[in-house]
Design a protein with these regions (language model features):
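Bacterial N-terminal signal peptides that target proteins for export
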Residues: 1-12
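Short, glycine-/small- and polar/acidic-enriched structural segments
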Residues: 119-127
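Pocket-flanking alpha-helical
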Residues: 83-115, 211
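C-terminal motif of bacterial Sec signal peptides marking the signal peptidase cleavage site
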Residues: 18-22
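Exported/periplasmic ABC-transporter solute-binding proteins
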Residues: 2-3, 24-56, 61-65, 69, ...
Length: 289
């Protein structure tokens, strides 16, 4: 039987809060662009470590390229994992400058442990189904075809706190369909990989994974109001807080949102909030900034 890791994660996070108490008040969530206090006045430098949900990998790698072009003295290092694992690693003492998760629940776990500062929503995502080309198992949607005899279905693990697993469980509740997967993964990219390799007949992933998956077909499903909201925050353990703030601002900028949209991410829920312009270097702007 699977063990719910959220209770253990929260306990570790709360212990970490004792040593981080000096970092101050309660963080809040916002989907607005960068504030004037946070806006970068020029180029930033140094290494910036970003812990980001696995579903963000392709978009964030492109964002990093643009960010480093605008800030030639900077270097961005990523750790892409399931959101719950990233928070657990922070709670256990790993250091990062930025945390970006695939849902607000895992970010709230981090906030409850004093691990992050102000949260800002920067994107949204919904579930979709991917199947190998030709759809050999005859999957028709989020329905009983996923439970048909011989169908090898792969989903994300809700009990491990994986955001796409939580969304999948909510979809089960909304549709009345109880899935019987062959395996449950701790990050959505693992689900995608199993379908791409032909190991699975169907996988429940995000729409962004479906857009980038190779050798697969997408079967869209109504979202039933189940939308994952992606927050980002600088961390209390940041060794380069200025760089972390600059990266957050870049993600929230027009350029950042343009790249996220390119990879299929939806706009933040507060779409009326005006994004910021990406900060240009103090001395010499690059053509591709």
């Amino acid at each position: 039987m699977r063990i719910d890791r959220r209770a253990a994660l929260t306990a570790v996070a709360l212990l970490s809060a004792v040593s981080l108490a000096a970092c101050g008040g309660s963080p809040s969530r916002s989907s607005t662009g960068a504030s004037s206090d946070d806006a970068a006045s020029g180029a930033v430098g140094g290494e910036i470590t970003v812990f980001a949900a696995a579903s963000l990998q392709k978009a964030y790698e492109e964002i990093s390229t643009s960010f480093q072009e605008a800030n030639p003295g900077s270097s961005v290092t990523f750790d892409f994992q399931g959101s719950q694992d990233l928070v657990s690693n922070l709670a256990e003492g790993s250091t990062a400058d930025v945390l970006a998760t695939a849902d607000t629940r895992t970010m709230d776990d981090a906030a409850g442990g004093g691990l992050v500062g102000e949260q800002r929503e920067f994107a949204t995502n919904v579930l979709s189904i991917i199947v190998p080309e030709g759809n050999p198992a005859g999957i028709t949607g989020f329905d009983e075809s996923l439970n048909a005899e011989g169908v090898n279905l792969v989903i994300c693990d809700d009990q491990a706190g994986v955001p796409c697993g939580t969304a999948t469980r909510e979809m089960e509740e909304a549709t009345g369909v109880t899935l019987h997967p062959a395996s449950e993964e701790t990050k959505v990219s693992s689900v995608q990989e199993k379908v791409e390799s032909g190991e699975a007949d169907a996988g429940i992933v995000y729409a962004t994974n479906a857009a980038s998956a190779k050798g697969t077909e997408e079967i869209t499903i109504p979202d039933h109001g189940i939308v994952n909201h992606y927050p980002i925050a600088t961390t209390a353990s940041a060794s380069n807080p200025a760089g972390g703030r600059a990266f957050v601002d870049f993600v929230l900028s027009d350029k950042g949102r343009e790249i996220l949209a390119k990879y299929g991410f939806g706009a933040p829920s507060d779409s009326s909030a005006a994004p910021t312009s990406a900060a240009a270097p103090a001395e010499e702007a690059t053509e591709n900034g």
